[in-house]
């Protein structure tokens, strides 16, 4: 009887197929997202970075990042200071809790340097200006009026100058 059970189990064992675990596709973040995550992480750690964000960048075009930034600014205005641990306690009741934790988890090296936040801000500006530049160039192709084309052309030139200044500043640092 033991041998019969043993043989039965072996035959059942051969029928069982290993089910591979579901593939977890890890999405890579683009330069804008990485920069935004770092800026927000810096802001969660010290109000001086909140001030730098407000004066040097002002807003994020992406709603998710803009809402988290506004939440941090609100927290600083209410509490007159910010520390990561206290902000995380506050975030527990925030509707943005998941976004806030996702940002914190994305930071690989949590070193905070003032020069780095400026690099991240410049990345954001450059990307936003490049997107604006594409939009203006597409608009310019559709416009018939010479005066309108000229106005848009000036905006394009101004944006190109701003982008080149940021790229030049970055290449000097490297």
Mark where each language-model region is:
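Bacterial replisome coupling helices
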Residues: 77-174
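Charge-patterned, long linear interaction tracts outside catalytic cores
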Residues: 1-15
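Phenylalanine-focused residue identity feature
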Residues: 2, 59-60, 87
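Non-catalytic protein-protein interaction segments used by genome-maintenance enzymes to assemble
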Residues: 11-79, 101
């Amino acid at each position: 009887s033991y041998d019969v059970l043993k043989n039965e189990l072996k035959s059942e064992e051969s029928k069982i197929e290993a089910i591979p675990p579901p593939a977890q596709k890890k999405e890579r973040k683009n330069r804008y997202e990485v920069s935004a995550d770092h800026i927000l992480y810096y802001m969660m750690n010290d109000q001086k970075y909140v001030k730098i964000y407000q004066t040097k960048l002002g807003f994020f075009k992406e709603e998710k990042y803009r809402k988290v930034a506004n939440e941090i600014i609100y927290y600083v205005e209410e509490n007159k200071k910010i520390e990561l641990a206290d902000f995380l306690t506050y975030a527990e009741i925030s509707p943005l809790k998941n976004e806030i934790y996702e940002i914190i988890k994305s930071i690989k090296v949590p070193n905070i340097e003032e020069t780095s936040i400026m690099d991240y801000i410049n990345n954001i500006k450059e990307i936003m200006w490049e997107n604006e530049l594409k939009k203006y160039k597409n608009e310019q192709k559709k416009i018939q009026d010479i005066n309108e084309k000229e106005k848009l052309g000036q905006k394009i030139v101004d944006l190109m100058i701003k982008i080149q200044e940021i790229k030049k500043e970055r290449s000097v640092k490297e």
